[in-house]
């Protein structure tokens, strides 16, 4: 491995850490400001009613759920809708960390009582020009990924 390749790998890892931290910061801020829609069904309803208010779509899934055909169909439809409406999309793994960030009670995680965290929408109402550092960072990452022909970038949330 050449020095340039080594530096590029290090930069990519550092960029991934920065984007992951930005996503975490963004989710917490969006939830605090009531700008977060949680759940596949709830997200589909919002995108049907007001797609212009959606600025980011997070599709969350862990490896053990990859074989869930119904969930994959939902994701495909949501991704298509997001692409048609110029909404940034990020695939996320680390459902436990996601639940932790959103304040899900530990006893409900993985049960039927737990909220559906597979699809999260961050909204920005038309009357408000909300900008957060996290949103800018994630949008930049999405744009950069599209430039590299990775239409749905992927990040992994690490448990803490």
From Swiss-Prot:
GO aspect biological process, one term: cell differentiation
A Pfam family matched in the record: Ribosomal_L7Ae
Family of this protein: Belongs to the GADD45 family.
Official protein name in the record: Growth arrest and DNA damage-inducible protein GADD45 beta
UniProt function note: Involved in the regulation of growth and apoptosis. Mediates activation of stress-responsive MTK1/MEKK4 MAPKKK.
Assembly mode: Interacts with GADD45GIP1.
Domain of life: Eukaryota
């Amino acid at each position: 491995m050449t020095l340039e390749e080594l530096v590029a790998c290090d930069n990519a890892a550092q960029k991934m850490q920065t984007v992951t931290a930005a996503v975490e910061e963004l989710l917490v801020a969006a939830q605090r400001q009531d700008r977060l829609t949680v759940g596949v069904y709830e997200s589909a309803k919002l995108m049907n009613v007001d797609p212009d208010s959606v600025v980011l779509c997070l599709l969350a899934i862990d490896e053990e759920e990859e074989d869930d055909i119904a969930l994959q169909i939902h994701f495909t439809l949501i991704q298509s809708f997001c692409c048609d409406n110029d909404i940034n999309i990020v695939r996320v793994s680390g459902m436990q960390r996601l639940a932790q960030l959103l304040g899900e009670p530990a006893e409900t995680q993985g049960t039927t009582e737990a909220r559906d965290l597979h699809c999260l929408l961050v909204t920005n109402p038309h009357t408000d020009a909300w900008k957060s550092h996290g949103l800018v960072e994630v949008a930049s990452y999405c744009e950069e990924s599209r430039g590299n022909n990775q239409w749905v970038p992927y990040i992994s949330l690490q448990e803490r």
